[in-house]
């Protein structure tokens, strides 16, 4: 399986939304949120996809907040999970953040999402806080992770 990572484009929107719909732990953006992201062409936002010969297998979206990057959404297709795709996506995002002078990367993750938490901890993200009741759909806390880059 040959994998490649590239910047997402508006043509990727249907595949991104389809993948996200089947990823229970993804952020579940609306079509309007994705469309606005692609329309804005903002240097403060980065969207990457990982794909193979059969198409899109995952994506990550981050935004710049005062020299820190916030990971807003990350998802990997069900059949592609546990094969290192999330690790590769996150590695590429961190490389880009470092290359653009970021001081740190942070994110929120569901307390119950053990697989994602293990991925972030593998990259040396540290738990830096908790947002009580952050996920309203299940009244679940968010764990805030942060990785210093400098």
Where in the sequence are the language-model features?
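Short secondary-structure transition/capping segments
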Residues: 74-75, 117-119, 139-142
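Accessory recognition modules or surfaces
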Residues: 87, 140-148
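Conserved catalytic-core motifs of GNAT/GCN5-like acyltransferases
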Residues: 67, 108, 126-142
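Acetyl-CoA-dependent GNAT
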Residues: 2-3, 7-79, 83, 90-96, ...
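Conserved glycine-rich acetyl-CoA-binding loop
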Residues: 77-91, 98-100, 104, 110-118, ...
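A short beta-turn/loop motif at secondary-structure boundaries
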Residues: 38-41, 112, 134-138
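Short aromatic/hydrophobic contact patches that present stacked aromatics
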Residues: 73-75, 106-108, 144-146
């Amino acid at each position: 399986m040959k994998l490649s990572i590239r910047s997402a484009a508006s043509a990727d929107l249907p595949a991104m939304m389809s993948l996200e719909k089947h990823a229970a732990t993804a952020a579940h953006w609306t079509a309007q949120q994705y469309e606005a992201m692609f329309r804005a062409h903002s240097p403060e936002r980065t969207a990457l996809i990982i794909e193979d010969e059969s198409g899109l297998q995952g994506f990550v979206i981050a935004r710049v907040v005062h020299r820190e990057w916030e990971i807003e959404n990350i998802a990997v297709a069900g059949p592609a999970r546990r094969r290192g795709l999330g690790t590769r996506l996150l590695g590429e995002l961190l490389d880009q953040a470092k290359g653009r002078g970021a001081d740190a990367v942070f994110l929120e993750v569901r307390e119950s999402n053990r697989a994602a938490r293990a991925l972030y901890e593998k990259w040396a993200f540290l738990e830096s806080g908790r947002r009580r009741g952050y996920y309203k759909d299940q009244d679940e806390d968010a764990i805030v992770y942060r990785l210093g880059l400098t």
